[in-house]
Every structure is written in C-alpha cells, then in structure tokens.
C-alpha cells in the first residue's frame, strides 16, 4: 500500500488576442516550483498595499512566451513531468488519475487534448501506452486495453461512445463490490492508438452535435475518459495465471469561473440549476480531505455523493489512486480573482493523501463474490414475502448483468466495438457529417460546411459535404439533419449551379441568417460566409474553387476602405479567421433593428468618459498648480539657497506631472476593461434572451424576455472603484397577466439549462415530462419570486473621527439610480480614540508601530498594544419604500474587515395585527444594534475617511404586483414621491429683525413689538422719537424643513429704505411676501411638464396608431398612460399645491411663532441640478434675490447701514441706523393715530453651500413713532410684560433648483428598456434613449457626492450642538440644535493653561475640516502655546490650525465644506482687525505704527451692489488709525513683524469698538480689597460711553498708546492691569473715581471668554464695567474659567451655563453695566440698485402693489 499526496502542477498560458488588445498586464510570475501572483494595478491606496501571493506546487509550467526557450514549458515537458509517472503507476497495477482544473479559456483542453501539431496529455499518454505494450508484451505477459468516454452535464451522465447519440442520460449506481459505476456505459476494446483516436474523434463529434442541438455550453460540462489496462501474467511452468487491472481516468473539468466569480450583491444564489453543483462539491470534497490530511478532522464527513462527478471520482480523491492535478491559469490582470481562486483550490488539493494499492487478480475474486450474491438474491426472492419483489428483481438483474459483462471474452468485446463503430458511422453519414478524422482538412475540390462552436475542442469538428442540391432540416429525409430550437422539418435548400454559383433558399418561417442578416429569399453565397440556421446552428461555408479574387478587386475599387460593414469585411480576405464569437456578435448586431446597441452604449459612454476625463485632468492640474504655488511661498530665499529651491520646485513639478499621467493611465485602463466587459455582457444577454424567447414561444408559455439595464449593486456603494462602467444588463421576465420579474444574466443562464431539458422532453413526448416539470418548478417564470434589491444606503463614517453620534435618514439608491426610500441609521463610537500621530499622517510609511499604542510596563520597558475602536451600528427603520417591494424587507451589510455579512431582520410581532392603511407599507421597523471592535490601522483610517458603510436593503414583491398601474394608491405614492423630490432641493431659513434704542442707562435695548390682527409683518415696532437706534438682523436655519445642504456663513451688509406710510383704516397692510421667484419656479416646472406632455402625447399617438400591437406595444402603452396620469397630478400640484404638501407655494398650514409672518415667500437660486453649482458668479448685482422685490419697493431709495458688530453664537449682525438720513417726514415726526410706517430691511448674506454665492433677503417692518408713553400705555405695558415681543421675522423657502426627476421624459425603468433595445428614435431634444439613460445613471456619482456633503454637515452640526464653538450657521436635517456663528474672528489665543480663551477659531479656512473635527487637550509642547501668537489683519491668513496636533487627516470629501472666503481672498474685506498690544518694546511699537499707516490706505468694506453710491465714512477727530482689512501679503508681513495674539477687530463702520485685552488674564494680580477690579486696555481705539456722574470731555475718541504695565500678581482669580493715561488723556485730571464694583463681581464663577464678549455694550454675561480714576483708565472684565481645565470636557451652553440668559438680568444693574459711548452723528449711504427704475417701473396702485397670495 502506498500513501502519496496528490501531485499538483500549475500551468500559465500565453496572453490571448483579447488581452493583448486590452493591454492588460501580466500578474503571474514563476520561479522553480513557486508561483507568485501580483495584485493587479489599482488606483486606490489599498490596491498598492496588497502584497503578492506566493504558492508552492510540485511543478510550475511557464508557457507564456515560446521565445524564452530556457523557461518555456511545452506539451512534451508537461507529459514528461505528469504523464510518464502516471503511466508507470498504471503498469504497476495502481489506479491513476489526472484532472485539469481552471477557468474557461485558461488552456485546460489544450493541455489535455492539444491539437494536431502539439498533442496534449491524453494523446501522448495513449500513444506511449501502446508503445510500451508493444515493448513489454510476450508469451508470459499480455495486455488488454478498454476505453470509455462520458460527459457529465447538469448532473446527468451521457455516453459519448453510444452509437444512438448522447441524448439519453445514464444512471450512476454504487455496488458494494465494484463501488460507484455508470450503468450502461459503453466500455469498448481497443488494440492501437489509432482505435482510441478514432473513438475520441467520433465521441467529440457526437458531443458537438448534441451540444449544438441543445445549445449547451461544452465549457460547462465535465468530460471523463477512462482507460482500463488489464495485464495477464502466465507462469509457463505451472500453467497458472494472474491479472493486474488498473484504471486511468483523464478528467477535463468545466470552467471554474462560475464558482469563483461572485455576483454584484455578494454570493449570488445559483438558482434553478445544478450546472455548478459538481465543481462546488469537488471543492468541498478537496477541503474535507485536506483537513483530514492535516489532522483537523479525522472523522469529518466527505460529501462524495453530493454530486455525480465526485461520486464517480471517489477512488481518485483520497482513495485507491495515484492522482495528479493540473491547474491552468491566465496571466492577465483582469482575471486576477479567477486566477487566485484556482491557485487556492490547487493549494488545498496538494494536501490530499491517497492510499493506492495494486489491483492484483481482481476478476476471479469479483466473479466469485458476485455469484455468491446472485445465489443469495435468488433465495431471498423465492422466500421473502415482506420485501417487495420489484426491488429484489432489480438487484438481481443488476448483478446478473455485471457477471455477464465480466465473463465476456476479449474477442466478443472486439466484435462489439467494431459493430458499434459501424453503427455510429452510419448515423453520422445519415446526418450528412463527414467521417474524416482530420476535421476540415478535406479535398480542395469539394464544397462543404464546417461547424462553429464556442469550445475550441469542438470547433470546426463537423464537416458537411454539399451536393448539387442539398436539403437541410430536422426530418430524416433531409441530406443534412439538424435538430434543436428553431429548426423546421424542411428548413432550407442549397443549390450549386453549373457555373459554380451557390445559392441558399430558405423555407417559410425557417430562420436563416447569412453574415448576420436574416434572409427570406434566394441569396447567393460566397466563400467564408457565415450561416445561422435556427437559434444556434452556426456554420461557415468553404468554396475552394470560388475565392472571388476578381470580384473582390471590383468591390475594393467601389467601396472605401474606411466604411464597410461586417458583410464587406467578411469578403475582404480569402482565408478569413471567423470564429464562433464573431459570427454570434454579427448576428446580434444586425438582428436588433439593423443597429448596434453595444456600439451605441460604448460610444455614449466613451463620449461622457472623455468629457469627465478632460474636466478631471483640468481639476487635477489646477490642484497641483496650487500645491506648487504653496511650495514657492514656503520657500523663502533666506532659509534655502536658490539652487535647492529651484531643484525642489522642478522635482515637484515633475512629480505632479507624473501623478497626473499615472492617474490618467490607470483610469483609461480601467475604463477600457469595463467597456470590454460591458460589450461581452450585452452580447451574452441578447443571445440568451433570444433563445429563451424561442423556447417560450415554441412551448406556448406566454412569457416574454427582454434585456434591460441596471446599475450593479457594487456600483451603488461609495466604496466602488472609480471610473468603472456604472451599468450592466439584466433580464426582464414578463408573463401575461402576471407582474414583471428582473433576473440577472447568471440566473437566466441557469434557467435556460432547465428550459432546454424541458423542451427536449416536450419534443420527444416523454411521458414523465409533467412529473419532472412539477418537481423542478417552472423554469420560465418563478411562481415564488426571490428577494429583490431595493437599493443601497451609504453611511459615511467620518463621525468616528469626531466622537459624535450620527443620526441620519440615509437615502436608499435603487439600481435605476433613483432614491427608493430612506434608511434611518445611527452610527457612533463607543470606546477608543483616533491616535494623534496616525490622524496627522495616516499615510506615514516610516512608522512600523502605527497601529499600536506605546505603553510603559512595570519594568520600565516600552511595549506596544494594538489600538482598538468600538463602534455601534443601529438600524432603526426604513421609510418611503416602494409599495411593490415592501414585503419581507431586510438589510444586509459588511462592516470593514468582517468576513460574513450582517443581516438585520425586521421587527415582526405576530400578536399585533398588521395595519390596514396604505401608508403602513411604506415603513419597516428594525431593532438592529451591533457593536464592532476594529483595530485602528492606516487602512481603517483611510476607509472611514473615504469610504462608507454600504447597507443593502432587500425586499420581496407583494402579491398584487400585477394590479393596474394607475390605481389611486399608485397616485398617492406619486404625490409622496413629489414631496420627497422637492424636499431634497428646499430648505427654510428665518430672518429676524429687532430694533435697539439707547435707553436711560446708556445701553442699547430692544424696542417692543406690538402685535395686532391687521398687521402682516409680525408686529409694529414702538420707536421713540429722536433716539439713537441700531438694527439687529439674525438669520437662522429651520430644522426638518428640507435636506438641501444650506450654510449661511455671514451677514455681509444691511440696508434699509422704502419708507411708506399707510392708513390703517383705508389701505391694506403690507408684508414681506412676493411671488417673483415662485412664479419663476412654477414657470420652469411647467415648461418641463409641457415638454413631457408633448413627448407623451406623441408616443401614445404613435403606439395607438399601430394596426397590430405586440405584447411590448401594449405594455408600452400602459406605461405611457400611467406616466400621463401622473403628469396630470403633477400639473395640478404646480397650479394648486395642497397645504402641507412640501411643494413651493403651498398654502401656509402652520401656526407661526409670535412675531413671525404667516406667509412664506420663495427664493429661487437656480443652480445646476447635477452638482448644485452656479452657472455664474452670484455676487453683487447678480446675487440671488436681488430682483425679488416686494410690493411698493419700486424705485425706492435704500441706505447702507454700517455694521457695528457680529454675534459669536449665531449669524447675526448689529448695524447703526440714523433714521434722519432718510429725510422722511414719517420717520421724523410722531406717527398719527390711524397711520402706520412701513420700511424694508434688506440683508445680504454669504452662502458657502450649496454654492459659493450671495443671497439678498428682504423683511418688511412696521413702525410706530411716539414721543412719550401715556399713563394708559405704560400701565398696559406693565400688565402684559410677559407677552411682549421684541423681534419680528419672515421664513423664506430656499429652492436650489427644479428636481431633476421632474425634467426626465421617461421613468428610469422604461428608459432602461428603451436604451437596451437601442431604439433608433431620439427624444425631443435630439438625444437618443441610451444617451438619456446613461446620463441619468451617471448621476449616481453626484447623488453620492451630495449625500457625502449632507452627512458631513450633519456631523458638524452635531459637533456644534455638543460644544458651541463652530462659528458659522450650518443647515442640514437630523440635528435639532444649531449653533450659528460669525466666521470673521481674527485669531486664536491661549492662556497659561494651554487651552484657548476663544472657544474656537474658524477663521483658518485654509485648513481642513479636521481642525474642528476632534477634541483633545492641546499638548503642552504645541508650537501654538507661546503667548506671542501670530496676529493677522486678514481673518483668513492663518495657515496652521490650533487643533492640528490632535485632529485626524481631513477626509477628502470635506474640501467643499470649507468656507468660500478662502477661495475669494481678493474680495473686499468684511471688516478690519486692529491689534491689541501686550507688553510691547519700543521697536515693536514703531513697527506697529508703520504697519498701521499702511493699513490706513485701504477702504472699508462696501458690498458690490452699493458700489455706485458714496461710501459712508465717519469723520473722526485726531484719528490716525482707520480700521480696514489688508490683503494676503500684508497679512504675511504683519505676522512677521508682530508676535502677539490677535483679538476681535473693530469694524469698518466708522464707530469705535470696545475691546479689552485678553492677554494673559490669568497672570494678572488682583487686589484682595474691595477696591475696584481693573482690566487693561490695550486697544488702539476705545469707544467710551458717558457714565452717570461728572461728564467726560467730548473728545474721548482715542485710547492710550502707552505700553501696558502690570500692577502685580495675586492669588485670586480676577486680575487687573492698570494703564497710565497720557498727558492728553481724554479724562480730565479732576475726574473723581466712580464707586467700587460690588464684591460679588470678583466672586463670579470663572468661564472662558470669547473674544467678541470683550466688546463693551450689551454683553452676554452682563459683568462688564468701567471705572475711571485720576491718572489711569481701568476697564474690568471678569473671566469665567471652568474649574476643570480639561479642554475635552468643555461643554459650553450644553453644560447649563446659558450665558445668553445673563444679558437680560443686567437691565437695572447700573453698577455692572457702565458704558462709555459717544455716538457721533453719522449719515448713512443712500443705496438703490442702478437699474431699479428700468427693471421695475413704479407702481402707484395699491392693488397692483400688493402681492397675490
């Protein structure tokens, strides 16, 4: 007994023509017995990091390049290594086996069979076998050889040597003596190699005929050739004899790619077929045997009997056999996955251990045992009553048959073989097939047909000679007999005329194609023409005498070489190389409306790809240019020699160019491969559909199949490869009276196998066909359809960086590229952190321990622990699902590196009855919650930065999916869809206006707003005559009002005008409602609907006018009617939208909050629907909303109000308003009793998203001017104090664009069908259907980009809710609390503790979102810890983020989230930033003064729309410093010149800003006495208000320029700095000191002071006071620092310290709110659009002026 492992060899074939055309790279390398598989070239970082796979085998055959003689392994080498060893074992009496494994086209058949010039393993083995027999045979030793040849296809065994053909399938039985065997398999005796060759040739012909008749793919069948060698040994002396019997099995397995390839949605179920069962089971058997050999499972069950193949090969796998395996692989990169699968398969197989024994003298023993069994069975049969006689009888017949076969003499076997060979020859001759074994190498003088087959082993194997009159058909009387789908009993005739002309005449209803063109009349044939009969009988005609050289010359003269079709191409060569694929492609291209759908698809995709490529390359070039510019700026001449700088720039430039080139090459490569794949798939799909339709029509199944297009599920994920084709063919199966099912190509392939079997049984009238039919189910249409993919929801995981919970309703994108509902998910980080160093540079290659954390153990050694992160995924519910797929919905996803998919099942409570309402079908609840622990690596960080968690949502079709499509429920769904569509492009924002007046305490306090029923503006402001006023404008987003990603960045300008007086009794009140933009939206919407209606009318008319309507036409008509009805509903929605429908212009269906107007005006941004980009620069006079004028606004004059300050916590601006500039009698006098004053406040805001643009918002306000409140009014005010309102507002609905789906003429499903059908006609705009569909499908990229943006903004909102430090207004759904803030802070300062006084600085727009993405304590050695920061007069000049040290690398998709100001640095500044000094040296002071003179030259900011008016500029006495904003170069100069921290700036308003120093507050001494607290003033400008007591001199307009002096240090928390006054101080020397501040002031809890809170005036905390003493000025500001100094625990407002609330308490506390202000009498700038009169003529009539609601 010999225990040996299975020998495994691997052979790599040369590149084929297709791979050479695609320029694919070779990824396989062989050295000795090692095979190295390199990862294919990829444009992702993960691809670059993949290591090569190394495998070791017994033999590695390099057959790539024949010219490399030292390395090349030919057929002879393969035979010597494998064949000779097998042959030797066979002669020793061992069983032996060789099986070839690999994907289709990898060279299995070539290795096993070869061809005439290069014989393969089997012919060489047989030849060597008989050569050795000839040498060794003598008197004492004789040899007998028998062969059998069978095919296993779809779990059925067919005898290829059977003369009756291989139609009948044989049964596999297992005998306890013989083991598994095939009952009835021919075992023929042979005496020479020629006999074997003849039998194999005839067997292959039978196989070809059967495969062609049934249209089976021979590459999907297994062929087993058995050679049984019997050695008889004679002892001449004693006369005894003994036998050795060995069986050699040569197995050519089916193509393995069916198993290794997985479908788009994970491993697709192989439905309805056993085609892959054998290979799958073989893999399981090999794995089980490998585990047994490794000692893992000695008793592990080996599933031999699960498939016919493994059952028959039981002895060869792990049993009594010497087995070798040859694995054939492709070297091409595009076959990487299949190659890897094959190598892994072979790697496991080499571990199998077989136990071979010599089979000595088995016959005598077998015969004896069989005879004993026969006697026992006869006895049982006569005696047994309990057992059923038929079973025993069958067993008895089986054993007797075996005995008979074993006792047949050798001579009888030879006679039987001869008789079978003659019968087969007669049968082949009757079919018209030549018996020549040499294939098509026949006489030169004969005309013949040769078959074309996809399998190279069967191609051109059958030769049919033509007579003068040849009849072709299925009837036995025909000269050439063909059987199969579409072949008529009498199909066609071929005639050869006397002059040599050959013609083909098809019969009626007999499908005949010549060169792909369907022919109905007599057609002349030429040499090389391709003929198709029926569905799948392809032939090529060979006419040796008629090569038509003369005719070709004439043809070439007449036809341009550039423009000839396939027909001409076929005639261009006398010896054309036309294979099966060419003929098949030719038929498909010419059958479908004589058009090439594949070419259309390819052309459209190529055109769009080139456009994308050009755009992307341009963007790439600009990006690299920006990088180079930054490098040039960083390389200062002082630091580096000029030569090194230029070298570095040259190198950078070269590297940038290389990157662009490499990126373009990789993208081109991927695109070429994708196009080739799409072409193959479309050809294949059309072929399969044609055959399925033939079968269904023949068998009257009332089922129709057609090709449609869909997006592969893998391409709906954000993790997909970029540049891949985003569409794939799919099959629509439709049965009359039933719904439509969508099948994959693989599914139809598998179904077709059962269809063919059923068809064959139906043709042969097999009585058990019905029984088999019932058992298998109907392969034409599924009664119980399996689950369908509803769509894929992409959850971007950036929130794991930020440690915030992402709660979001993720859109589910369907395979037609539409949103098919929303999945409500929650993703959060439970434990673990993102490491700082890795976060800073997750691509650093020099850190070997990047995925671990350094920890010092007890012994002092540094050990590395793996960093872990736990994140939780919760799936709550799916809403808005399509009603047809809302049965049994479940979710499936794979998180990061998890091996298995996670399935989330829906919540089903059997006790609760399902609700009957229609809406219930739209929502499915889940209770899925799962935690994942992952190791933090660079790859994982890259995944959460760039990738997404793709959750697939699956569902089953509802039972009533065949109901009429325009039912009421369907219309409800349409309305819901309409709401969802508009929800994606709309967002609401509120504009609140309040007016502040100077009160008796010197504070600006909000005036009251009296509300009344007849007031439409929200209320009437009660203004006191002659008081100084300010206007405060606040812009807020409205939560849950739409999913448009809207970001209001800042208020740019505030203007006021259009003063109108109205009678309360005689005239209607005015408000802020206008319909300019709403009318524009409705007009655009109506235009789109009119286009669709015209198109639908035309299509319906076209279909209706058809005299004979096909099934397709009727369904098309039904779909058109459905769309027409839906269009009517949509048109109604345009004109009369239902209240609360979410459609712009819908009647207000809400109760507005106090002060809010009821009606909601619309503003239309008119952005590009694809990517929400603006077609032009929407700034200044082109800003959105400029022309959205209100009634009575025509020709009115507006005045620009200087902005005093911006708010830190929201987008809010306070502007000074001097009402006298209007020169209006109505504003200067007390308002009469029955009169009301109306004004319009116009606010220009900066949007950063959805596009960088300016937006003009208008709010009409009503005012009443009084002199003094009467006693009654005063009493009323006190009684109703609680309900007093101080601000009024209006809600705007912002519409970015018309929903894209509205403009689509066909629904996506129909468009996909029309595109796949490749209809010639175009749509109204000249585009073809395929172009429309492809453009629509390519929008998935945009959907994902916008979704990335929406989720990123949601994360930022979550951050702002968690800690109020983001100073911008963010607006997206799913977050309840929004922190709106001002983006123009000037810098960032830190105190001794190493944490910032500012909550956060977002002025550093050049840095990425990472600056605010994480929290963490700033390291003590941070370069930003020094007190002397880098000041900047430019708010955006900072280039280093304060959070750089502990935030992750910016995700690539966060670039668009940066404020647009960084991109528009050349725009006029919003405001200037003067500097606060700390303890300056004289030199620094001089530098400062020099810079300040420079800055004086710049002008204050004026919006572009006011450029035509005189600039408002206050005249300031003795003012040397004019606040302004310098450009970027001044910023850099200033950073270099001065080294200190900046603070809030004064604004270019002509007013002074009250600023206190925030420099080292914790270092200042505080006296312990009750004397006044002191705080230094270092600002260059201080605005002083008049305190109660002795008045100050009126020229208090300048602050001291003296350097700060520190008074001393104390132990208390509150510190002061005293500043000595100059001689020309604003305070007179005799000014007495005000009263001390109460002691409570010094005991206030500490907190972080925001820069803007240092402004004097109505501050937020209300603890700001000023005291003036002789000789010095002190300003006190009490800071509030958290007791716990950990920056990570700072919670801001969410901790309950609501600082805003403290401001209200400060009224009536004069000692705490002393303000020194001196308002100069400034005039505003009159503002009026230059073209206002031209665009909008003045309307006098009240009725015209009032907007219609």
Curated annotation (Swiss-Prot):
Keyword field contains Transcription regulation: no
Protein name stated in the entry: Kinesin-like protein KIF13A
Protein residues bound to ATP: 102-109
Organism encoding this protein: Mus musculus (Mouse)
Gene assigned in the entry: Kif13a
Biased composition regions of type Basic and acidic residues, renumbered to the chain: 1421-1430, 1719-1741
Domain FHA: 469-519
UniProt keyword terms in alphabetical order: ATP-binding, Cell cycle, Cell division, Coiled coil, Cytoplasm, Cytoskeleton, Endosome, Golgi apparatus, Membrane, Microtubule, Motor protein, Nucleotide-binding, Phosphoprotein, Protein transport, Transport
Record-annotated Kinesin motor domain positions: 5-352
Subunit structure, as described in the record: Interacts with AP1G1 and AP1G2. Interacts with ZFYVE26. Interacts with AP2B1.
Pfam families in the cross-refs: DUF3694, FHA, KIF1B, Kinesin, Kinesin_assoc
């Amino acid at each position: 007994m010999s225990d040996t492992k299975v020998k495994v060899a691997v052979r790599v074939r040369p590149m084929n023509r297709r791979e050479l055309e695609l320029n694919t790279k070779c990824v396989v390398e062989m050295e000795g017995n090692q095979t190295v598989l390199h990862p294919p070239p990829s444009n992702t970082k993960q691809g670059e990091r993949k290591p090569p796979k190394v495998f070791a085998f017994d033999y590695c055959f390099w057959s790539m390049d024949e010219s490399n003689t030292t390395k090349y392994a030919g057929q002879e080498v393969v035979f010597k290594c494998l064949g000779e060893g097998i042959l030797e074992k066979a002669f020793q009496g061992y069983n032996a086996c060789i099986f070839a494994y690999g994907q289709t086209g990898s060279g299995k058949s070539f290795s096993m069979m070869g061809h005439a010039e290069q014989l393969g393993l089997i012919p060489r083995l047989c030849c060597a076998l008989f050569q050795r027999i000839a040498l060794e045979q003598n008197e004492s030793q004789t040899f007998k050889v028998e062969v059998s040849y069978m095919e296993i296809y779809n779990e059925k065994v067919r005898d290829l040597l059977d003369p009756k053909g291989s139609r009948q399938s044989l049964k596999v039985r297992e005998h306890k003596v013989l083991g598994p065997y095939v009952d009835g398999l021919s075992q023929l005796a042979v005496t020479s190699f020629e006999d074997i060759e003849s039998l194999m040739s005839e067997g292959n012909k039978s196989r070809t005929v059967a495969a062609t008749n049934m249209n089976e793919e021979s590459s999907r069948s297994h062929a087993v050739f058995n050679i049984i060698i019997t050695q008889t040994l004679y002892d001449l002396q004693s006369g005894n004899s003994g036998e050795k019997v060995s069986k050699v099995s040569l197995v050519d397995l089916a193509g393995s790619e069916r198993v290794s390839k997985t479908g788009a949605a994970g491993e697709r179920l192989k439905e309805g077929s056993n085609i892959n069962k054998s290979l799958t089971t073989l893999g399981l058997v090999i794995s089980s045997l490998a585990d047994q050999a490794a000692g893992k499972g000695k008793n592990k069950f080996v599933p031999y009997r699960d498939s016919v193949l493994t059952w028959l090969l039981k002895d060869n796998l792990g049993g009594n056999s010497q087995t070798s395996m040859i694995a054939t692989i492709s070297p091409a990169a595009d076959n990487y996955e299949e190659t890897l699968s094959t190598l892994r398969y072979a790697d496991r197989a080499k571990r199998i251990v077989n136990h071979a024994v010599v089979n000595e003298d088995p016959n005598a023993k077998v015969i004896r045992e069989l005879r004993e069994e026969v006697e026992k069975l006869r006895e049982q049969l006569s005696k047994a009553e309990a057992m059923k006689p038929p079973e025993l009888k069958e067993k008895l017949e089986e054993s007797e048959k075996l005995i008979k076969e074993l006792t047949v003499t050798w001579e009888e076997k030879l006679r039987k073989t001869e008789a079978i060979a003659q019968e087969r020859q007669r049968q082949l001759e009757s079919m018209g097939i030549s018996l020549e074994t040499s294939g098509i190498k026949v006489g030169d003088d004969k005309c013949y047909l040769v078959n074309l087959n996809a399998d190279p082993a069967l191609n051109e194997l059958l030769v049919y000679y033509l007579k003068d009159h040849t009849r072709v058909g299925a009837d036995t009387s025909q000269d050439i007999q063909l059987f199969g789908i579409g072949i008529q009993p009498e199909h066609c005739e071929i005639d050869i005329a006397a002059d040599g002309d050959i013609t083909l005449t098809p019969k009626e209803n007999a499908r005949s194609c010549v060169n792909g063109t369907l022919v109905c009349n007599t057609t002349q044939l030429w040499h090389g023409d391709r003929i198709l009969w029926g569905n799948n009988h392809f032939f090529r005609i060979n006419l040796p005498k008629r090569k038509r050289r003369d005719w070709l010359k004439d043809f070439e003269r007449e036809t341009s070489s550039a423009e000839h079709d396939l027909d001409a191409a076929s005639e261009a060569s006398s010896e054309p190389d036309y294979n099966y694929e060419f003929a098949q492609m030719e038929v498909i291209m010419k059958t479908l409306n004589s058009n090439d759908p594949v070419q259309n698809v390819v052309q459209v995709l190529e055109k769009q790809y080139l456009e994308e490529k050009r755009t992307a390359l341009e963007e790439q070039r600009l990006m690299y240019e920006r990088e180079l510019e930054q490098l040039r700026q960083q390389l200062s001449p002082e630091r580096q020699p000029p030569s090194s700088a230029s070298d570095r720039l040259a190198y950078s430039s070269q590297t940038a160019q290389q990157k662009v080139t490499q990126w373009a090459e990789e993208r081109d490569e991927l695109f070429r491969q994708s196009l080739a794949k799409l072409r193959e798939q479309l050809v294949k799909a059309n072929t399969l559909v044609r055959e399925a339709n033939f079968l269904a029509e023949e068998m009257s199944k009332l089922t129709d199949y057609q090709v449609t297009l869909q997006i592969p599920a893998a391409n709906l994920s954000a993790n997909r490869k970029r540049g891949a084709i985003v569409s794939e063919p799919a099959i629509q199966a439709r049965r009359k009276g039933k719904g439509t099912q969508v099948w994959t190509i693989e599914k139809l392939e598998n179904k077709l196998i059962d269809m063919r079997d059923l068809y064959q049984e139906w043709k042969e009238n097999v009585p058990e066909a019905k029984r088999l039919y019932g058992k298998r189910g109907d392969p034409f249409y599924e009664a119980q359809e399996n689950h369908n993919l509803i769509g894929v929801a992409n959850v971007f995981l950036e929130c794991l960086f930020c440690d915030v919970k992402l709660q979001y309703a993720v859109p589910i994108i369907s395979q037609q590229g539409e949103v098919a509902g929303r999945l409500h998910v929650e993703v959060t980080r439970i434990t673990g952190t993102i490491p700082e160093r890795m976060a800073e540079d997750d691509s650093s290659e020099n850190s070997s321990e990047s995925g671990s954390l350094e920890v010092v153990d007890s012994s002092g050694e540094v050990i590395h622990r793996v960093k872990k992160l736990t994140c939780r995924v919760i799936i709550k519910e799916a809403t808005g699902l399509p009603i047809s797929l809302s049965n049994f919905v479940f979710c499936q996803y794979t998180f990061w590196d998890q091996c298995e998919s996670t399935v989330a099942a829906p919540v089903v409570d059997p006790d609760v009855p399902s609700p009957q309402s229609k809406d219930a079908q739209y929502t499915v609840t889940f209770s899925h919650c799962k935690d994942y622990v992952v190791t933090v690596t660079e790859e994982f960080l890259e995944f959460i930065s760039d990738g997404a968690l793709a959750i697939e949502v699956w569902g089953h079709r509802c039972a009533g999916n065949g109901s009429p499509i325009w039912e009421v429920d369907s219309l409800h769904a349409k309305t819901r869809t309409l709401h969802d569509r508009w929800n994606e492009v709309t967002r609401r924002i509120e504009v609140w206006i309040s007016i502040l007046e100077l009160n008796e305490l010197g504070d600006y306090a909000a005036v009251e707003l009296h509300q009344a029923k007849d007031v439409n503006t929200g209320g009437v402001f009660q203004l006191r005559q002659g008081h100084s006023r300010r206007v405060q404008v606040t812009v807020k987003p409205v939560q849950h009002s739409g999913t448009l990603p809207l970001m209001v960045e800042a208020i740019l300008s505030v203007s006021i005008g259009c003063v109108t007086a109205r009678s309360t009794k005689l005239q209607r009140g005015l408000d802020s409602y206008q319909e300019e933009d709403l009318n524009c939206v409705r007009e655009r919407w109506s235009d789109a609907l009119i286009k669709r209606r015209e198109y639908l009318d035309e299509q319906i008319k076209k279909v209706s006018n058809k005299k004979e309507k096909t099934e397709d036409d009727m369904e098309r008509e039904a779909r058109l009617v459905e769309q027409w009805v839906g269009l009517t509903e949509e048109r109604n929605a345009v004109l009369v939208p239902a209240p609360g429908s979410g459609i712009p212009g819908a009647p207000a269906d809400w109760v507005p909050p106090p002060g809010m107007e009821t009606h909601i005006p619309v503003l239309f941004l008119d952005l590009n629907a694809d990517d929400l980009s603006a077609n032009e620069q929407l700034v200044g006079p082109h800003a959105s909303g400029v022309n959205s004028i209100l009634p009575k606004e025509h020709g009115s004059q507006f005045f620009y109000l200087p902005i005093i300050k911006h708010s830190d916590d929201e987008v809010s601006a306070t502007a000074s308003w001097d009402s006298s500039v209007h020169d209006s009698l109505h504003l200067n006098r007390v308002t009469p009793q029955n009169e009301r004053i109306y004004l319009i406040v116009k606010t220009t805001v900066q949007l950063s998203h959805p596009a960088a643009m300016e937006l003009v918002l208008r709010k009409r306000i009503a005012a009443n001017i009084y002199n003094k409140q009467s006693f009654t009014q005063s009493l009323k005010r006190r009684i109703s104090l609680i309900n007093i309102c101080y601000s009024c507002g209006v809600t705007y609905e912002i519409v970015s664009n018309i929903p894209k789906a509205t403009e689509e003429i066909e629904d996506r499903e129909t468009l996909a069908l029309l595109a796949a059908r490749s209809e010639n006609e175009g749509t109204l705009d000249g585009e073809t259907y395929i172009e429309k569909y492809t453009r629509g499908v390519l929008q998935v990229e945009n959907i994902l980009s916008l979704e990335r943006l929406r989720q990123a903004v949601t994360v930022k909102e979550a951050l702002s809710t968690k800690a109020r430090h983001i100073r911008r207004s963010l607006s997206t759904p799913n977050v309840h609390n929004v922190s709106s803030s001002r983006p123009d802070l000037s810098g960032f300062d830190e105190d001794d503790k190493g944490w910032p006084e500012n909550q956060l600085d977002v002025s550093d727009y050049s840095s990425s979102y990472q600056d605010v993405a994480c929290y963490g304590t700033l390291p003590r050695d941070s370069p930003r810890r020094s007190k002397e920061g880098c000041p900047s007069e430019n708010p955006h000049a900072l280039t280093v983020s304060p959070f750089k040290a502990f935030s992750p690398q910016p995700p690539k998709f966060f670039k668009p989230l940066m404020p647009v100001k960084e991109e528009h640095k050349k725009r006029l500044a919003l405001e200037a930033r003067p500097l606060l000094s700390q303890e300056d040296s004289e030199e620094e002071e001089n530098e400062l003064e020099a810079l300040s003179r420079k800055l004086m030259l710049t002008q204050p900011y004026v919006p572009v729309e006011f450029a035509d008016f005189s600039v408002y500029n206050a005249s300031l006495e003795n003012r040397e410093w004019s606040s302004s904003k310098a450009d970027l170069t001044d910023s850099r100069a200033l950073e270099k010149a001065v080294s200190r921290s900046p603070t809030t700036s004064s604004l270019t308003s002509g007013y002074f800003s009250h600023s206190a120093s925030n420099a080292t507050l914790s270092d200042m001494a505080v006296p312990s006495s009750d004397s006044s607290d002191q705080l230094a003033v270092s600002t260059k400008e201080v605005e002083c208000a008049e305190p109660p007591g002795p008045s100050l001199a009126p020229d208090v307009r300048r602050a001291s320029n003296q350097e700060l002096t520190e008074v001393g240090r104390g132990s208390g928390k509150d510190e002061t700095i005293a500043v000595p006054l100059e001689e020309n101080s604003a305070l007179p020397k005799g000014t007495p000191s005000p009263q001390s501040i109460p002691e409570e002031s010094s005991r206030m809890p500490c907190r972080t002071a925001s820069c803007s809170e240092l402004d004097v005036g109505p501050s937020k905390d209300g603890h700001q006071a000023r005291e003036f003493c002789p000789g010095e000025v002190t300003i006190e500001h009490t800071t509030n620092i958290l007791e716990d100094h950990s920056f990570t625990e700072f919670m801001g407002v969410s901790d309950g310290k609501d600082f805003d609330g403290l401001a209200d308490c400060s009224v009536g506390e004069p000692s705490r709110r002393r303000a020194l202000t001196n308002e100069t009498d400034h005039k505003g700038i009159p503002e009026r659009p230059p073209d206002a009169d031209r665009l909008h003529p003045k309307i006098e009539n009240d009725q015209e002026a009032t907007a219609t609601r």
